[in-house]
Amino acid sequence: MAAKIIDGKTIAQQVRSEVAQKVQARVAAGLRAPGLAVVLVGSNPASQIYVASKRKACEEVGFVSRSYDLPETTSEAELLELIDTLNADNTIDGILVQLPLPAGIDNVKVLERIAPDKDVDGFHPYNVGRLCQRAPRLRPCTPRGIVTLLERYNIDTFGLNAVVIGASNIVGRPMSMELLLAGCTTTVTHRFTKDLRRHVEHADLLIVAVGKPGFIPGEWIKEGAIVIDVGINRLENGKVVGDVVFEDAAARASYITPVPGGVGPMTVATLIENTLQACVEYHDPQGK
């Protein structure tokens, strides 16, 4: 079986085009364009690349993008003060603080300081709690982006045995909640899981997010499984690969995401969706 490639680039562009049309309609109706504040502390090269892609995406869909590039020496108190200012700014619908933060700054304290109605990354305990209670509002971007991919490819997830490899707060844990909403029987594996291969071999839907190149061999994949590879790993030769051995897995799967060009573009597209949602649902005069 040769797997069908799930083209995240194309779907992400569709999502961004849909958002752009809605923004144009808002502005034509006399409403303001949504605003996103992107905060970067320090000069981590990978973070700078991620932030640049998010800013570019904002501008392409017609958002107001405001950048805050702070030095590595920024204190936690200074960062929290900036977040307080942005929370009170009526022209800003979403606040994104790029992780990781420098040593000495508490990630949890910073993320919890962002107002839940401006938490477009979906990391605030309020938004994670809403997802757990089956009443989601602003949803974590990567898991929601994966669900969008499955929906756009008309993949029926109800009744599937889904296995998530990795239990991070950013992907694994919220992904398990999204899969429950999508009707899956869901297993989350982690570093203490015994006999990982057995879990993988029984997965109708496999989502891998561990950040280790080639972590899941292709021969572990169940025939006809749907494989979603969240990993983005750069090898010494410069090649970017996922957590799954792609060629071998693609020979057994029914659908598979490539790396790059699979899940990654959907994370940014969902951030854009979340920002528009925050603007419309929370911050418009007629919003809830």
Swiss-Prot record:
The keyword rRNA-binding does not apply. Pathway: One-carbon metabolism; tetrahydrofolate interconversion. One of its GO terms (cellular component) is cytosol. NADP(+) binds at residues 166-168, 232. It catalyses: (6R)-5,10-methylene-5,6,7,8-tetrahydrofolate + NADP(+) = (6R)-5,10-methenyltetrahydrofolate + NADPH; (6R)-5,10-methenyltetrahydrofolate + H2O = (6R)-10-formyltetrahydrofolate + H(+). Pfam families: THF_DHG_CYH, THF_DHG_CYH_C. One of its GO terms (molecular function) is methenyltetrahydrofolate cyclohydrolase activity. Keywords: Amino-acid biosynthesis, Histidine biosynthesis, Hydrolase, Methionine biosynthesis, Multifunctional enzyme, NADP, One-carbon metabolism, Oxidoreductase, Purine biosynthesis. The keyword Transcription does not apply. Its EC number is 1.5.1.5, 3.5.4.9. One of its GO terms (biological process) is L-histidine biosynthetic process. InterPro entries: Aminoacid_DH-like_N_sf, NAD(P)-bd_dom_sf, THF_DH/CycHdrlase, THF_DH/CycHdrlase_cat_dom, THF_DH/CycHdrlase_CS, THF_DH/CycHdrlase_NAD-bd_dom. Belongs to the tetrahydrofolate dehydrogenase/cyclohydrolase family. Catalyzes the oxidation of 5,10-methylenetetrahydrofolate to 5,10-methenyltetrahydrofolate and then the hydrolysis of 5,10-methenyltetrahydrofolate to 10-formyltetrahydrofolate. Homodimer. This is Bifunctional protein FolD. It comes from Citrobacter koseri (strain ATCC BAA-895 / CDC 4225-83 / SGSC4696).
